[in-house]
Design a protein with these regions (language model features):
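Phosphate/oxyanion-binding active-site loops and adjacent basic polyanion-contact surfaces
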Residues: 105, 125-134, 168, 191, ...
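Phosphate-binding glycine-rich/basic clefts of nucleotide- and phosphate-handling proteins
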Residues: 37-40, 64-65, 228-360
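Phosphate/pyrophosphate-binding loops at sites that engage ATP/ADP/AMP, CoA/4′-phosphopantetheine
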Residues: 137-152, 385-402
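Conserved phosphate-binding/catalytic loops in two-lobed NTP-binding clefts
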Residues: 183-191, 416-442
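Glycine-rich beta-strand-to-loop/alpha-helix junction loops that act as flexible
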Residues: 156-157, 402-409
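Nucleotide/phosphate-binding catalytic cleft detector across ATP-hydrolyzing
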Residues: 1-22, 93-213, 230, 234, ...
C-alpha cells in the first residue's frame, strides 16, 4: 500500500487515497500533523532504541559503529533504553520543557540534512533520527489501514537547507531515502513539494492555467510555475508542464528566529555595553536562537562559550540582563525562546499588537510586539522569499494566471500583502496550508504506484 509522506521541517503528515480523494491520517492527539520534534534521554538512546525495540538494522559500516558506541555509552551511563525512551511531537516537547537540562531534544532534523562539512558519524546520527521519526509515523499510519504500508512518495524542497548546492541536496535526499528504507518502505519516490501542492490545487481546476505555487515551509521556500488542468491528470510524464523552479533556504523557522532576534534578544542584554562603554558582541545572542544552524548552536552551547558568557555578565553595564542569556545557555532554552517568537508571529496574524512573556527565563520578563515591529524584524527574510518568486518568473518566462500560496506561513498577512504588491492583479488562491503538499504527494503516489 502507498502513502504520500510530507516529512516537513515544522510538521510531518501522511495521506492515503480513499474513493479518489486524499485522506490525511491521524498522527497525534487526533491531529493529522506531528510536529517535527524528538526527544530521548541521550542522543545515543535513539540508535539503541531503533535496534533493540524495533529491530531496525544498522546497515552501513558507520551506522554499525554508531550503534556499538551508543550501546556502550548507555551501558556505562546506566541508561536503560525502553520502548518509551524516545518520544515524538508535542509529547517530546513536554518532556523537554519539564527538564531541558536532562533531555536530548531535536526540533526540525530536516533542517540539518544538507549541512556542509558533516562527518560520516554525523550523517549516520541524522539518518537514525530521521529513521526513528519515519518509523513512528509509519506505525501510527499502519494502525489506521488494513494493508501493509510499504510504498511512499516523499516530498522534498527544491533546495534543502545548506550551502553545498547539488552536493547538499544529494546528501539530504540520500539520508531521507536510506532512513525510509530502514523504516520499512520498500519503494520510495521523491517529488518536489511545490509540485505536490500544485497537484492538489490542480484537482479543483476546470481548465488549463499557469499556476505559480509558492510553498513557504518551515525550513525552505519553494516556487514552481506549472501548467495545470484536467488534461494533465494521471500523467506520469509532466516535464512539459514544469515551466520553472526556484527555491531558497528560508522558511517559517527563519521568520521565527528573526523575530526572536529583533524583539526578544534585547530583553536579554543584546545591544548593551560593558562598564567601560564598549559595545558587547552581538554573535552570542544570534547563536543562541539560530536553532537551524548546527555550527551556531554547537558554538553557543560549548563550554568555552559558557565561560565567555560568565565573563560578559561580570563586565556588562546591565549585568542582570546578560545573566538571562547565560541562563539560556545553562538551561538550554533556545527552542523555547524561538517557540515563543513563533507563537507571537501567529498571534500577530489577526491583531495589531501581542503581549509576550518569557517566565521560563525570568518571572517578570515581558514585552509587546507590534505589527510594525513584526514587519521590521521579518523584512530581510521576506525579501529573500520575494526574490525566489522573481527568479521563478524569469526562469519560466511566463506570467502566472493565479498564485497558489501554501505552507505554514501562508496565513501571514505580511506575505500575502508582499505578493500582491509584487504581482498586482493576479489572484491569490489558498487551500489547506498544512495539508496540500501531503495531499498532492498521495495523488502522485496513486499515479506512480497504481
Amino acid at each position: 500500500m502507498f502513502i504520500g509522506f510530507d516529512y516537513g521541517t515544522a510538521n510531518c503528515s501522511v495521506a492515503i487515497m480513499q474513493n479518489g480523494q486524499p485522506l490525511l491520517l491521524k498522527m497525534e492527539n487526533q491531529s493529522t500533523l506531528l510536529p517535527s520534534m524528538l526527544c530521548a534521554p541521550t542522543r545515543e538512546a535513539v540508535s539503541e532504541w531503533l535496534f533493540r525495540h524495533h529491530q531496525v538494522p544498522a546497515t552501513a559500516a558507520e551506522s554499525q559503529a554508531l550503534l556499538r558506541r551508543a550501546v556502550s555509552f548507555n551501558r556505562e551511563e546506566d541508561i536503560d533504553v525502553t520502548p518509551s525512551s524516545v518520544q515524538f511531537g508535542l509529547s517530546s516537547l513536554g518532556h523537554y520543557i519539564d527538564d531541558p537540562e536532562e533531555v536530548y531534544f531535536v526540533k526540525s532534523p530536516k533542517s540539518f540534512l544538507g549541512a556542509s562539512g558533516l562527518k560520516p558519524q554525523q550523517v549516520a546520527m541524522f539518518e537514525d533520527l530521521v529513521c526513528a521519526m519515519m518509523l513512528h509515523i509509519r506505525n501510527q499510519a499502519q494502525t489506521q489501514v488494513p494493508e501493509a504500508i510499504d510504498q511512499a512518495v516523499i516530498g522534498r524542497p527544491i533546495n534543502f537547507q545548506g550551502l553545498g548546492g547539488d552536493e547538499a541536496n544529494q546528501q539530504a535526499q540520500g539520508i531521507l531515502e536510506r532512513a525510509a528504507h530502514r523504516a520499512g518502505f520498500r519503494d520510495v519516490i521523491f517529488q518536489y513539494e511545490p509540485v505536490a501542492a500544485g497537484l492538489d490545487f490542480e484537482a479543483t481546476l476546470t481548465e488549463e492555467k499557469r499556476v505559480l505555487v509558492v510553498d513557504i515551509g518551515g525550513g525552505t521556500t519553494d516556487c514552481s510555475l506549472l501548467l495545470m488542468g484536467p488534461q494533465w491528470h494521471n500523467r506520469r510524464d509532466r516535464e512539459n508542464s514544469l515551466l520553472g523552479h526556484s527555491g531558497c533556504r528560508v522558511g517559517g523557522n527563519d521568520l521565527d528566529i528573526a523575530l526572536a532576534f529583533k524583539s526578544l534578544m534585547p530583553l536579554l542584554g543584546m545591544g548593551g555595553q560593558t562598564e567601560k562603554g564598549i559595545a558587547l558582541p552581538i554573535l552570542p545572542w544570534w547563536n543562541a536562537i539560530a536553532i537551524n544552524d548546527v555550527p551556531a548552536q554547537s558554538d553557543f552551547y560549548s563550554s568555552a562559550n559558557g565561560r565567555f558568557l560568565n565573563d560578559m555578565v561580570r563586565d556588562a553595564r546591565e549585568a542582570d540582563k546578560v545573566a538571562l542569556l547565560y541562563k539560556v545557555w545553562r538551561q538550554r532554552l533556545s527552542y523555547r525562546v524561538v517557540r515563543t517568537a513563533e507563537e507571537s508571529k501567529i498571534a500577530l496574524s489577526d491583531r495589531p499588537e501581542h503581549a509576550v512573556s518569557l517566565p521560563f527565563i525570568s518571572e517578570d520578563l515581558a514585552t509587546a510586539i507590534s505589527q510594525e515591529g513584526l514587519e521590521t524584524a521579518l523584512a530581510q527574510p521576506l525579501q529573500r522569499i520575494l526574490e525566489q518568486v522573481q527568479l521563478v518568473l524569469e526562469n519560466g518566462k511566463e506570467k502566472p494566471d493565479v498564485i497558489y500560496l501554501t505552507g505554514g506561513s501562508a496565513r501571514s498577512p505580511l506575505i500575502k500583502k508582499a505578493l500582491a504588491e509584487q504581482l498586482p492583479g493576479i489572484p491569490i488562491a489558498g487551500g489547506d496550508d498544512f495539508g496540500s503538499v501531503t495531499a498532492g504527494l498521495a495523488r502522485w503516489a496513486q499515479v506512480m504506484f497504481s
